[in-house]
């Protein structure tokens, strides 16, 4: 009887060691942030779109060969590049995959596309979300 009990204790111990240390990040709040960003963009509201980003000097946006640091700098970049409703077009996100990295972080992979009168630019993105006191926010955005 002692051997099976030891085996049971050993087995349970390993299961506890291999179990996640923290609950996984919930994808629903992250999806809600992304949906709010799309809705804001499609209203022509860059400031509303930017609410999805961490309001921090460390927030980072990477696109092409350019790296932009800081929430305000990222916001200014968007405002300059998309200075009219025509340039903003209609945004959609698709193919979203959310991978929790623990209780307070997640990676999101997805595709973006803009429907505009003259063209339909599109690409991929990788976002690092962190759970902050104000909720889930993007701290790193790599868009191509």
State what each model feature region is:
Residues 4, 11-52, 56, 73:
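Short, low-complexity N-terminal intrinsically disordered segments enriched in polar/charged residues
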Residues 53-54, 65, 97, 110-112, ...:
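A mature extracytoplasmic/lumenal domain signature
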């Amino acid at each position: 009887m002692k051997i099976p009990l030891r085996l049971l204790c050993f087995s349970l111990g390993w299961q506890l060691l291999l179990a996640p240390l923290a609950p996984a990040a919930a994808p629903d709040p992250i999806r809600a942030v992304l949906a709010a960003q799309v809705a804001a963009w499609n209203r022509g509201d860059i400031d509303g779109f930017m609410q999805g980003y961490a309001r921090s000097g460390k927030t980072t946006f990477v696109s092409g060969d350019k790296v932009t640091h800081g929430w305000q700098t990222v916001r200014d970049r968007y405002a300059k590049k998309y200075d009219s409703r025509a340039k903003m077009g209609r945004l959609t996100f698709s193919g979203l995959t959310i991978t929790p990295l623990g209780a307070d972080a997640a990676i999101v992979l997805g595709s973006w596309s803009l429907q505009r009168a003259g063209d339909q630019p599109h690409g991929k993105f990788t976002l690092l979300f962190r759970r902050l006191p104000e909720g889930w926010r993007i701290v790193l955005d790599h868009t191509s």
